[in-house]
Amino acid sequence: RLTINLDMNHVDLERNNGLTIYGNSPKDTKIVRGIAAKFSDVHTDLSSKYSVNVNEIPSTAMPYNSDHAPFVYEIDNQPDDGMEYGKALVCYGSGSSEYHTYLDTMDRFNEESLAVSGIILGSFIRYLSYGERV
């Protein structure tokens, strides 16, 4: 149903404090946007420190530069009858710029920032599993 890519999702506070979550399903991004708003209300300590942007983009604009790409672009075995795209949510943090460079070391890693995407997307996964039950 959905691929969630949490690769390179930590924040480098020397660069900025942002996380970006984007996806190609209007329904999914709307739900995640609502979860992110609730996250800001409940986890004020983290939300005051880290900003979260949730964006919806068309399937044809999904980047083909990370692990989620085959699950978006390569699920249709017969594209001649009209391309069918897979759904994906992707989270990148400002720390992703160091990926595979000399700065990609654990001393620059910000484990606290992983809680932000973990709580938001973990809540979404729970929603997919159980619905709106409390």
Language-model features, listed with the residues they occupy:
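Metal-dependent peptidase/peptidase-like ectodomains
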Residues: 1-90
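His/Asp/Glu-rich mid-to-C-terminal helical/loop segments that flank catalytic regions of hydrolases
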Residues: 95-134
